[in-house]
Regions:
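Bacterial N-terminal signal peptides
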Residues: 6-16
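Conserved beta-strand hairpin/beta-sheet module of binuclear metal-dependent hydrolase folds
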Residues: 27-81, 211-223
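Active-site environment of divalent metal-dependent phosphoester hydrolases
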Residues: 48, 69-70, 95-101, 122-125, ...
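Active-site neighborhood of phospho(di)ester-bond hydrolases with catalytic His/Asp-centered motifs
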Residues: 63-65, 88-96, 116-119, 221-224, ...
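Active-site HxH/HxHxD metal-binding segment of metal-dependent hydrolases
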Residues: 80-180, 189, 283-284
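Core dinuclear metal-dependent hydrolase active-site scaffold
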Residues: 173-179, 183-215
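Divalent-metal (often Zn2+) His-rich catalytic cores of metallo-beta-lactamase-fold enzymes
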Residues: 220, 240-297, 301
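C-terminal regulatory/interaction regions
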Residues: 290-354
Length: 354
């Protein structure tokens, strides 16, 4: 989940978006019968999470259902080109809006579909996530659209951006939020035709209830936002548990990793870079706090030691370097300090003031 606005904002503006057409997703066949769908971001309003379809001779499992009904409908249209089998399972990895707000597409098309998530994820979806999103509903996105309307009035070239934002807001306004119908605690193994599909939860990581999916026969791991290509998003994370979870993923016999955003990975270099950064931040944060430094001071002190792993993620792109410093290092270090101050609750932490 990443946005320059609130992560799950909705708008109540009555705007016509009939003429706006979303492009089809990029479809990547990761392995036989395993397809990744990468949908277009909603401009500055937010990214859309990856969706993955696992095909079998008895049906389909969809991992993560995108951030809007329109996005998931485009993904389903592509799935229908690949198979006439029904979608039997939708697994939502965590509560961030861009991974589950499109679930209604599947429950409408397949009334018997099972919607699966970790028990903590269902708890978050049912209440705290809604409250977390409220500022965007009430102020941030309406203000964003108003700004775009003013810009488009002055410069017609800005009209496509406005059209896209209006479409996004209408989608968020009208999305029917579908809660999981099946939950689990630690592991859940599903048999879907010829495939064995393992759902696993190790610890609180990015959220209290992160699910990753493992296909042991195919040696594929699907991570949700536990890993993002190129840079993970550490807001409200659980540092020690997140590292434990990545270590568990690393221990699997996984030849391919499909992240929560971005293209699939056919080696573990990006995974290891994230693990290295997290280990260093955990160690540096503890040491700095003992010496009386605050989280911002600790972050600045450790940044030079993170450069090699940063380059694995950013390839020294200036924009990505800045995202690395904010989304991963800054936010993770603040959560390290929160964790050092005592046990973390499941409550969603606010964005650190900068």
């Amino acid at each position: 989940m990443r946005s320059l606005l609130a992560p799950a904002a909705i708008c109540a503006l009555a705007l016509s978006t009939a003429d706006y057409v979303r492009p089809a997703p990029q479809v990547i066949e990761v392995a036989k019968g395993i397809h990744l769908f990468i949908t277009k971001p909603y401009g500055e309003a937010g990214l859309d999470g990856n969706a993955v379809a696992i095909l079998s001779n008895d049906g389909v499992l969809v991992f993560d259902s995108n951030g809007t009904p329109a996005a998931s409908a485009l993904v389903l249209a592509e799935i229908r080109k690949l198979t006439d089998k029904p979608v039997r399972y939708v697994v939502n990895s965590h509560w961030h809006w861009d991974h589950w707000y499109g679930t209604e597409t599947y429950t409408k098309a397949f009334p018997g579909v099972k919607v699966v998530a970790h028990e903590k994820t269902r708890e978050m979806m049912a209440g705290p996530a809604i409250e977390f999103n409220r500022p965007g509903i009430e102020s941030q996105l309406p203000g964003y659209v108003a700004m775009l309307e003013k810009r488009a009035a002055e410069n017609p070239a800005a009209q496509p951006v406005l059209d896209e934002a209006r479409f996004f807001l209408e989608q968020k306004k009208n999305a029917k939020l579908v809660l999981p119908t099946q939950t689990y605690t630690d592991t859940l193994t599903l048999k879907l035709g010829e495939r064995e599909i393992q759902l696993r939860h190790v610890d609180r990581a990015v959220t209290p209830g992160d699910t990753f999916l493992y296909l042991p026969a195919e040696k594929i791991v699907i991570t949700g936002d536990l890993l993002v290509n190129p840079i993970a998003f550490a807001l409200s994370s659980y540092p020690t548990g997140w590292l434990r979870t990545l270590e568990a993923i690393d221990a699997l016999d996984g030849a391919i990793i499909i992240p929560g955003h971005g293209e699939p990975l056919r080696d573990k270099a990006l995974l290891h870079a994230h693990m290295n950064v997290m280990r260093e931040l955990l160690k540096a944060g503890k040491d700095a706090k003992q010496r009386g430094l605050d989280a911002d001071q600790a972050k600045e002190e450790v940044l030079p030691r993170l450069r090699a792993d940063m380059l694995v993620m950013t390839k020294d792109d200036p924009k990505l370097n800045e995202q690395f410093r904010i989304y991963l290092v800054d936010w993770f270090m603040h959560r390290v300090y929160d964790e050092l101050n005592g046990p973390l609750s499941d409550a969603i932490a606010p964005i650190p003031r900068r």
